[in-house]
């Protein structure tokens, strides 16, 4: 099927300023995840996945530990999730996920990014129906039948499974994340996941070209500069 999920390893920050932003975003997400689901990764699979991802993206251990210690202590900021949808340059579809302690500020900041790119921020549900909310796992392997059988035996609802270039990619509904990860860890003897995330995967792609490409890249850069923005999903193809 060749679903166009976003492997954020490819766009890992390169400069110190960009790294600082990445660390800040991870710190906020780890703190929020640990505070809501518990600080023990063995009992909080979402936290375990997040910590694995942070380590792969070379987030320093002291940044990770500080966020967990902060969650242990209670108190602190209360971050809420916020999600914004709309149409970006070239009429591509965009979803912006945020963690914020001030929703009014965050909405204003995100809307400004849309306006500067001559894009249109919409109401809830504007483009969401054109994305699948998926758990995605990518790991080394070539026996997709054995993987599929193990997932079915674990009563996991598999949306899709692909095998290409010595890697297997598994898609499940986001609600199946925990069961799927446990089953995959068992059948692969704890293989390392190249991708282990919950994402919004577009059902179709929108081709953009010409000036729209430059505007779109600036649009993504503006969103990435916002501390409250955690993830941006889109269906632009160029």
Curated annotation (Swiss-Prot):
SUPFAM superfamilies according to UniProt: YebC-like
Superkingdom classification of source: Bacteria
The keyword Ligase is assigned to this record: no
Swiss-Prot/TrEMBL keywords: Cytoplasm, DNA-binding, Transcription, Transcription regulation
Transcription among keywords: yes
Transmembrane residue ranges: none
Major localization listed first in the record, in broad terms: cytoplasm
Subcellular location: Cytoplasm
Pfam families per the UniProt record, alphabetical: TACO1_YebC_N (PF20772), Transcrip_reg (PF01709)
A GO MF label: DNA binding
Gene Ontology terms describing biological process: regulation of DNA-templated transcription
One GO CC term, this protein: cytosol
Family membership: Belongs to the TACO1 family.
Protein name, UniProt field: Probable transcriptional regulatory protein Sde_1551
């Amino acid at each position: 099927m060749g679903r166009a999920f976003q492997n954020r390893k490819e766009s890992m920050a390169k400069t110190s300023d960009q790294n600082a932003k990445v660390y800040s975003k991870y710190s906020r997400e780890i703190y929020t995840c640990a505070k809501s689901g518990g600080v023990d990764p063995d009992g909080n699979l979402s936290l375990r996945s997040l910590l694995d991802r942070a380590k792969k993206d070379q987030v320093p251990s002291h940044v990770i530990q500080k966020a967990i210690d902060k969650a242990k202590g209670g108190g602190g900021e209360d971050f809420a999730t916020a999600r914004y949808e709309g149409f970006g340059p070239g009429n591509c579809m965009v979803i912006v996920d945020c963690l914020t302690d001030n929703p009014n500020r965050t909405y204003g900041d995100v809307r400004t990014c849309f306006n500067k790119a001559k894009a249109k921020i919409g109401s809830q549900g504007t483009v969401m129906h054109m994305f699948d909310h998926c758990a995605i796992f990518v790991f080394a392997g070539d026996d997709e039948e054995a993987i599929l059988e193990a997932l079915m035996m674990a009563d996991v609802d598999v949306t899709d499974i692909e095998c290409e270039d010595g890697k297997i990619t598994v898609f499940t509904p986001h609600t199946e994340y925990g069961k799927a990860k446990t089953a995959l860890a068992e059948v692969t003897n704890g293989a390392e996941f190249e991708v282990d995330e919950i994402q919004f995967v577009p059902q179709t792609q929108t081709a953009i070209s010409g000036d729209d490409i430059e505007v779109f890249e600036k649009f993504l850069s503006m969103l990435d500069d916002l501390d409250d923005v955690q993830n941006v999903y889109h269906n632009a193809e160029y």
